[in-house]
């Protein structure tokens, strides 16, 4: 194990999929209740390196790199990255791990993917923890934007495929500056942590591991209607914990329609799930689980260790 290995890490995993492999890292007890950890857009499994050592170690935590991220294989040429394909990755991973029921811990984009898996396979999920992320992204009044996202996604992929440019080589300083400029919520320490897994050394510097076809998260996400959101929430069969950072994703939504859509979703979860839904606000920014993991660790630990059974929602 390298000197940069995360505290408590017990193994690196490589799970076979038709286009190559999904990489993951594991902590805790193999005999413990399983928890699948899902990272944010263009992040990787190392985003949980500082949080998981603070959680109960009698659980088994597996943090996967989504396809095209971290150490996971890129999708085959011509195959797009869509929300449904990321959801199917989860199904493949848990099948390889032989998990029949497990909990999900998802940050940002990982929470959206985990939420969609939760609603698609409700019988498989014991608990869902959303780290500064909505369960879904709802359609806003700006419907034209949705078409713009879809068009931009297609054009970007075609442009990348046509260019066939070799990977750009950077110094660590250059990559860190780029990363922090586009992610103001990241500290330098957290940025370096992500780059350790998100880059590969070559003779003249570092190259990014991520698939260049990945650009904007909006291009890969399916926006859903309020009716589908409410219907999906009614199908949930487990407890849900939503942790909101004071200066995080929800706070950054400037558009009134976006804020109103988020309020609708949270209110629907509160009224439908009742005691099955827990909403907690903590100090910090969108990456609080990395920069200040102590602010969320005890909340997540208590939620995971709660053993009361939930009635099935019919």
UniProtKB/Swiss-Prot annotation:
Q: In UniProt terms, what function does this protein have?
A: Probable serine hydrolase. May be related to cell muscle hypertrophy.
Main localisation = cytoplasm
**Compartments, as annotated in UniProt:** Cytoplasm, Perinuclear region; Peroxisome
| UniProt protein name | Serine hydrolase-like protein 2
Q: Does the keyword Signal apply?
A: no
PANTHER family with a match to the protein in the record = MONOACYLGLYCEROL LIPASE (PTHR43798), SERINE HYDROLASE-LIKE PROTEIN DDB_G0286239 (PTHR43798:SF14)
Q: Which Pfam families does the UniProt entry name for this protein?
A: Abhydrolase_1 (PF00561)
Q: What else is known?
A: This gene may have been partially duplicated (see SERHL).
An example GO CC term for this entry is: peroxisome
Q: Which gene encodes it?
A: SERHL2
């Amino acid at each position: 194990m390298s000197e940069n290995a995360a505290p408590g890490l017990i193994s690196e995993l490589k799970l076979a999929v038709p286009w190559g492999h999904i990489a993951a890292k594991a902590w805790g007890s193999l005999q413990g209740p399983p928890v699948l950890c899902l990272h944010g857009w263009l992040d990787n499994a190392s985003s949980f390196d500082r949080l998981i050592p603070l959680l109960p170690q009698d659980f088994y935590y597996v943090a996967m790199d989504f396809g095209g991220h971290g150490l996971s294989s890129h999708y085959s040429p011509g195959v797009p990255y869509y929300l449904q394909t990321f959801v199917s990755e989860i199904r493949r991973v848990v099948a390889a791990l032989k998990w029949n029921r497990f909990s999900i811990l998802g940050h940002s984009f990982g929470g959206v993917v985990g939420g969609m898996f939760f609603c698609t396979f409700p019988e498989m999920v014991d608990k869902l923890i959303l780290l500064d992320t909505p369960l879904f992204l709802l359609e806003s009044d700006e419907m034209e934007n949705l078409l713009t996202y879809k068009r931009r996604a297609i054009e970007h992929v075609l442009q990348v495929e046509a260019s066939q440019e070799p990977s750009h080589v950077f110094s660590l300083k250059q990559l860190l500056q780029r990363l922090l400029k586009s992610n103001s919520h990241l500290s330098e320490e957290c940025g370096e942590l992500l780059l350790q897994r998100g880059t590969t050394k070559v003779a003249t510097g570092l190259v990014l591991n991520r698939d260049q076809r990945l650009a904007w998260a909006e291009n890969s996400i399916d926006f859903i209607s309020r009716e589908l959101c409410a219907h999906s929430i009614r199908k949930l069969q487990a407890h849900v914990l939503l942790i909101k950072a004071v200066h995080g994703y929800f706070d950054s939504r400037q558009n009134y329609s976006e804020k109103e859509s988020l309020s609708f979703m949270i209110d629907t979860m509160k009224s439908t799930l009742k005691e099955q839904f827990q909403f907690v606000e903590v100090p910090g920014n969108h990456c609080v689980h990395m920069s200040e993991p102590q602010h969320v660790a005890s909340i997540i630990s208590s939620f995971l260790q709660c053993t009361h059974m939930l009635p099935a929602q019919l």
